[in-house]
Design a protein with these regions (language model features):
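Helix-breaking motifs and short loop linkers at transmembrane-helix boundaries and internal kinks
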Residues: 35, 67, 88-90
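Residue-level signature of mid-helix packing/kink "hotspots" within the transmembrane helices
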Residues: 49-53, 57, 138
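Conserved MFS/SLC helix-loop-helix module at the cytosolic interface between two early adjacent transmembrane helices
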Residues: 56-79, 83-86
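Small-residue (Gly/Pro/Ala) motifs that create kinks and tight helix-helix packing interfaces
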Residues: 59, 140-148
Length: 160
């Protein structure tokens, strides 16, 4: 059972890494369609980073109150909803609004699963955990590239 949980955590960290590099890969196509300056991606990144910091600092209280499983479930759901919000956002400010749950979800799941692995597994698994985040961060643009360069029925601003 411990191996099963570890595999699930590794998969969660792959999925945690996937959206982290998508904005940078998609922004060249999104930016002209949204009609915003190139540096607006930095605003979105800062909102996500701010949410991540807030969630990370609140993680201890959340984990004690709700447990790792519930925090992870809510965090992954928030991140998935944020990605859906990115995909459906009609304008930049809707993207900025979706960036809030993106950061909060990413920060809480990151802190929660790191804590769980640190408490229940050997130290080497922490290195593997972050390796799998890197796999996800690498795969994000790889998955996005064929979508963004084929002329599917998706508008260019809805690539993410």
């Amino acid at each position: 059972m411990a191996t099963f949980f570890l595999c699930m955590i590794y998969a969660a960290f792959i999925s945690l890494g996937l959206p982290d590099s998508l904005l940078g890969a998609a922004w060249p196509a999104m930016q002209p369609a949204l009609g915003v300056p190139l540096d607006s991606a930095g605003v979105l990144s800062m909102i996500v980073a701010g949410g991540t910091v807030v969630a990370s600092l609140s993680a201890d209280r959340m984990l004690h109150r709700f447990g790792t499983g519930r925090v992870t479930l809510v965090s992954v759901t928030m991140t998935a909803c944020a990605l859906l919000g990115y995909a459906l956002a009609p304008g930049f400010w809707w993207l900025a609004l979706a960036a809030v749950p993106m950061g909060l979800g990413a920060g809480a799941v990151d802190a929660g699963l790191n804590n769980f692995v640190a408490l229940h597994y050997e130290a080497r698994h922490m290195s593997w955990l972050h390796c799998f985040w890197g796999v996800g961060a690498t795969l994000g643009p790889v998955i996005l590239s064929p979508v963004s360069y084929t002329h599917l029925t998706l508008p260019t601003k809805r690539i993410v």
